[in-house]
């Protein structure tokens, strides 16, 4: 569509996806759009705590949730192929096989994942994702639970129990918030639906034990609880080098 939009004016384009031809495809367009708007308003009005918010707070709350939903993205990254190179392209430098992410050959990303931002940060980060899942549990608890399970699957979680941190360096260390997020999502879902998804807890528990064992053995062998309070530091800049 080529449209000339004058200053202070708007233009509207209606499209419809259908398996069959319609003689009047947009006959009920205004009614359908209005109905969907009403349904969306009713859904967001039913969310936990909305009744205690001001109108401005409800608007901010809804826009924030919309931003989270908008930040779902298909993410495809085969680490092994990146390390070895594509057969149809020039081979990468040998140093790549000894550099960052060289220990993550098992990692196969081919999923819809919640991103920090699909424009500025179009890659997942394990601890960002854990935080995303808590508000997502209000609007799509099944997706929130599936995201937490995804990072614990055998093609994501390292055999030693480490969660993949983020694309630039999957071996980086982020605060251990995955178990906390799983419990929070479980409780939010239980409060919303009236039933607790214990199967979800069972699915994540064993893998979280592996992750906890990695923390204890690799990051705190002296038993100093170094990954508790203060681990993050300021704006993801720790007071010590947490990758060593």
Language-model region placement:
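Active-site acid/base region of carbohydrate-active enzymes
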Residues: 69, 77-99, 103-104, 138-139, ...
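Solvent-exposed loop and edge beta-strand segments that line ligand/cofactor-binding
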Residues: 113-129, 163-175, 244
